[in-house]
C-alpha cells in the first residue's frame, strides 16, 4: 500500500489516481488526521507527501514523517512535500522570482533514480510560489533536477537515498512523463 499524506490540496487525488493506475493500492490521509505511530502500524511500502498551500511549517505531520521515517520508508515529496524535505534538512524556503501557477518549464536532470528513461530535458507543470533556496541548500541533499534558470526542481538525500523531492507536479496532464517518474519511484527500493 502507498500512503499519500494530503496537505489539503486539490491535486492529491490526481496523484492517488496515477498511483492506482500503476497498479498500487493507495490510502490518502490528511496531514492532521494521522501520526507517525499510526503510519508505522499501517506499514506502507512507500509514502508520498502531497502538494499543498502554505509553507513547510504549515504542513501538519509532513515534517515529522520525513524526520522519523526517511531512513526506513521510501518517501517522495511533491511541491510542498519537496519544500518540506529541504526545510527539515536545514534549507531556506524562499519566494520564487516568478510565481509559477499552471506554467510549464523545461526540466533538466541527472538521468538517475527518478529520472531514468526520461527525456532530458522534459516539460513539467509547476504550481508554486516558494522554492528551496539554492544559496542555502542543505549539504546532505543533492540537486537532481533544475530549470534553465537554475531553480531547483528535485533533490535526493545523500545518505537516505529513499528520500526524494520534486517541485513540479508529475500528476499534471502537461507534465510529459509524470507517470513514468511516479513509476520509477514506485518501482525503486
From Swiss-Prot:
GO terms for cellular component: chloroplast; cytosol. Keywords: Amino-acid biosynthesis, Aromatic amino acid biosynthesis, Chloroplast, Glutamine amidotransferase, Lyase, Plastid, Tryptophan biosynthesis. PROSITE patterns: GATASE_TYPE_1. Its EC number is 4.1.3.27. It is an enzyme of class 4 (lyase). Component I catalyzes the formation of anthranilate using ammonia rather than glutamine, whereas component II provides glutamine amidotransferase activity. This is Anthranilate synthase component 2. The gene is trpG.
Amino acid at each position: 500500500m502507498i500512503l499519500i499524506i494530503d496537505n489539503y490540496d486539490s491535486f492529491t487525488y490526481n496523484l492517488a489516481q496515477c498511483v492506482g493506475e500503476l497498479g498500487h493500492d493507495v490510502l490518502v490521509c490528511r496531514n492532521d488526521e494521522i501520526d507517525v505511530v499510526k503510519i508505522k502500524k499501517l506499514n506502507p511500502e512507500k509514502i508520498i507527501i502531497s502538494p499543498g498551500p502554505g509553507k513547510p511549517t504549515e504542513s501538519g505531520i509532513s515534517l515529522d514523517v520525513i524526520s522519523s521515517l526517511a531512513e526506513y520508508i521510501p518517501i517522495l515529496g511533491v511541491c510542498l512535500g519537496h519544500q518540506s524535505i529541504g526545510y527539515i534538512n536545514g534549507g531556506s524556503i524562499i519566494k520564487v522570482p516568478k510565481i509559477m501557477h499552471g506554467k510549464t518549464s523545461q526540466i533538466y536532470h541527472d538521468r538517475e533514480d527518478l529520472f531514468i528513461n526520461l527525456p532530458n530535458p522534459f516539460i513539467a507543470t509547476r504550481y508554486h510560489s516558494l522554492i528551496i533556496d539554492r544559496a542555502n541548500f542543505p549539504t546532505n541533499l543533492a540537486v537532481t533536477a533544475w530549470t534553465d534558470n537554475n531553480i531547483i526542481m528535485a533533490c535526493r538525500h545523500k545518505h537516505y537515498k529513499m528520500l526524494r523531492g520534486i517541485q513540479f507536479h508529475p500528476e499534471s496532464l502537461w507534465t510529459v512523463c509524470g507517470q513514468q517518474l511516479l513509476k520509477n519511484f514506485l518501482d525503486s527500493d
